[in-house]
Amino acid sequence: MVVMINGSFGVGKTTIARLLRSSLPGSIIFDPEWFGFILNRINLKRSESWDYQDLVLWRRSTVAGVRLFSLFAHGAVIVPIAFSNREYFDEVVTAIRNLDPGLRVFCLRASLATVKKRLVERGTKIEGPGSEWIARRIIECEEAHGDAYFGEPVDTENYSARQVADEIMRRITK
């Protein structure tokens, strides 16, 4: 089983993924962001974009990573990810669904104010020089995640991480 946790930066994807891993025996987390960091580090960018999701290599590697992790997991593969581009989302989700027709995609949601507050609390700079990219991305995610296109909506606004993880567990085990 593959469980994709979509949502904006700061909405709690990694925290929820860790809680799900502890609730799903044999599960592992595959975070495609790690590969994105590698691509940024080795500077494979072929455009002005600073978003590794713009790279076909990243999108195909995300699918390949899910496939490989699925071979070695003794439970679910949990994939925290921040999609707001429908084309990229469709490309990756369709390919993963071809590997695992039971793919579950959830989209964590919180207000822009809450997301900003959480990012600041964890030490992420969201205003001023050097923060333009993340400021733009959290707004893009907020706007894109207003409907269920990017996954089954899960409200995180007034809920603890444990409550959110429990809600996702309830949905995938019913």
Language-model features: locations:
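P-loop (Walker A) phosphate-binding loop of NTP-binding proteins
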Residues: 8
